[in-house]
């Protein structure tokens, strides 16, 4: 058992503690058990270890699509977490959602089994590959999915058949949903680097992409300064290059805090020019130039201006077309294309490959259309993500009324960002805020936080119409039915949030079918 998990006889679970010696590999793990194996970040790692021949099993509270997939691969999954599940295991893996009093943690502790955080497993996998990490408050899954897509579809030689560990699923070329984990035979690993618990401090990638460092997860970091300091530290661990978005003020603060050596190998991508950005601390600028004000055709067009000396002696202008709309996706694609070029892929080949990217699951995912009312699902759960989503919606559907059912994620986040959520949601025409998805929190600890926390802030804003554009409805099934009754021909309904609001898509589509003639009125 790791030293950080023994303290005066108690069990300490510290996600920031590194549990493995530098020379250890995944083949030193022995029989490995994942607690909460159906979680997005856990199932990916379990599958990757399984593909590499490690004996893997796990447990979870209930069946899910993730556990179904793992079982189809031959991985044993027990439902219900109990001591017997870890008998005879060498390594037990936990995530930050697991508490020290979990019966499997207690049993593993008593048996002297090695207990490690999921980030320790990912760090082991990285050490054997040319790793590219993607960190940031928003855009991690989409950016890492784009890079994996480029490598899968255009990689040759050592860049072919990459490994990837992505928290969400990916839409393949044919629209099929692919799992976010794969242990490839190539020498590249693309991984999301989750900053929420500080565990990304363990990673030492060749290339570190930082999409943004807007304050989030202050329940862990305490202050914005501490949060950004973690990104400064993470950037310093990249051995070859750092790729950062310059459109985020938090990132610019991180950039200016880097030491000269790290800043000198940093590439900034931005829709702004050098004069607008100001001091870049010696970093190289790649500028993004958008080609149009809308993406009504369904495509996003932009040009990358790559200075000479970065990937060749001559300055390059690379035209890029995306299937997924939004300036935020142009930024995400720029990071992925630059990373692919730094890995050794021809930049034109990389930009051509990203054109066929259909999106990560639950990122502007069109779920269906009935009576010309389109239903779109998105994972956005932070005000900046919601604002970017609704900006993209306006570009993609400039003539449509945009209706949103938003399920807040975490009581603490809802309270802290209530005003910012209201301002972001004001970009829509019609909004219903549902009950809050608690995740790891408990309602009794936040008795004053309800849908009205956001609605009350929103009603202070100037908005047309002034009174009835937003309302709170605790039950999401009721919210879905209400939104269907309000919808008309040509509208777009978005289900938004990181919780189980995605389940309402089918409910909405079936209700639209039942009210087909009303929608056409």
From Swiss-Prot:
Keyword vocabulary terms for this entry: ATP-binding, Cell cycle, Cell division, Cell shape, Cell wall biogenesis/degradation, Cytoplasm, Ligase, Nucleotide-binding, Peptidoglycan synthesis
Enzyme Commission no: 6.3.2.8
Where is this chain's protein located in or outside the cell? Cytoplasm
InterPro entries given in the database record: Mur-like_cat_sf, Mur_ligase_C, Mur_ligase_C_dom_sf, Mur_ligase_cen, Mur_ligase_N, MurCDEF_pg_biosynth, UDP-N-AcMur_Ala_ligase_MurC
What reaction is this protein's catalytic activity?
UDP-N-acetyl-alpha-D-muramate + L-alanine + ATP = UDP-N-acetyl-alpha-D-muramoyl-L-alanine + ADP + phosphate + H(+)
Q: Which domain of life is it from?
A: Bacteria
Query: Which residue windows are transmembrane per the record?
Result: none
Choose any GO biological process term that the UniProt entry carries and state it: cell wall organization
* Pathway named in the protein's UniProt entry: Cell wall biogenesis; peptidoglycan biosynthesis
HAMAP family cross-referenced by the UniProt entry:
MurC
Name of the protein in question: UDP-N-acetylmuramate--L-alanine ligase
Q: What is the lineage of its organism?
A: Bacteria, Bacillati, Actinomycetota, Actinomycetes, Bifidobacteriales
